[in-house]
Amino acid sequence: MALVLGSAALHPFRDLLIKGQSFPESAYLGVTGSWVIFAALQTVWLDQTLTLPIEVWPLVAGSALGLFIYYLCVMLTLKAGDLSIYYPIIRSSPLAIVAIGYVFLERYYSPLTLVGISLTLLGAIMIQYRRGAGLLQRPKLILTATAAMIGSAIYGLSDSVAMETISPAPFLFWVYTVLTLAFMAFFTLTRPAQRPLSQQLLGCWGSAPLHVLASGALSYASYVLILFAFQAGGEVAVVSAIRQVSIPFSVLLGALVLKEQRVLTRLAWSLLLASGVALIIAGA
């Protein structure tokens, strides 16, 4: 429990620190690349090996795919959206974990779980509601935030299985090496014609290098705590649900640091969303 709560306290700072970067592609590339370095240092510090068993490599691929979807959709969402509106949707991965279990594992859920799903969806919609602007004011951002949530569920499931046989640092080293290379290729191919490649991939380092490094360090520490929780026997959906205490925290950060508006209303709906996630797990 303490590991997950510690992770929840650290997690929102990653997106807060790189929100509003002039070159968000380079910022996210910088964060993922920093994880490779941190994982290598942790591996050396703990006197571990970077060699992985053959059976773990499909989980590396699954985790990297989920992370690619997650990071890309978070970047697209936060380019145009308030942190406190969309972060709660992005972090509602227990909803996707329960859905994947139902569709692919033939798991059936109690009425309590269905109530939790309803509360989660209501909270997610109402967080971004503005009176007079229409209920679904920015449906494209709802879509990218939801895709990020699904990506989070994919890598969470992959990582929880991997932690049954491997230590966090070597696993993260290879996952983030694959992810960083994938992002380098993707951002190179999608670079605007008028933007130099060096600016596309490294632009953030000239304007906010400390923000990128701090974001990488805090997010790495946050997720290593989650992997330790998986190693200790934590069930992925339960761990993800407890981590949802970061949702109201993100709303407060958005108001205090980014000066986002309507914080009390959004905080109320964020609490409803988090309550719905808790009910999903309680009834699963």
What are these regions (language model features)?
Residues L10, R14, G66-C73, S93-I100, ...:
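Membrane-embedded alpha-helical core segments of multi-pass
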Residues M1-A8, T51-L67, E106-L122, A169-L181, ...:
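Structural signature of hydrophobic alpha-helical transmembrane segments
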Residues S34-A39, I89-V103, V178-A182, S222, ...:
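Alpha-helical transmembrane segments of compact multi-pass small-molecule transporters, enriched
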Residues M1-G62, Y71-G81, Y129-T144, T177-A232, ...:
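Membrane-interface interhelical linkers
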Residues V36-A39, V98-Y102, L112-R131, T265-A284:
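Hydrophobic transmembrane alpha-helices of multi-pass small-molecule transport proteins
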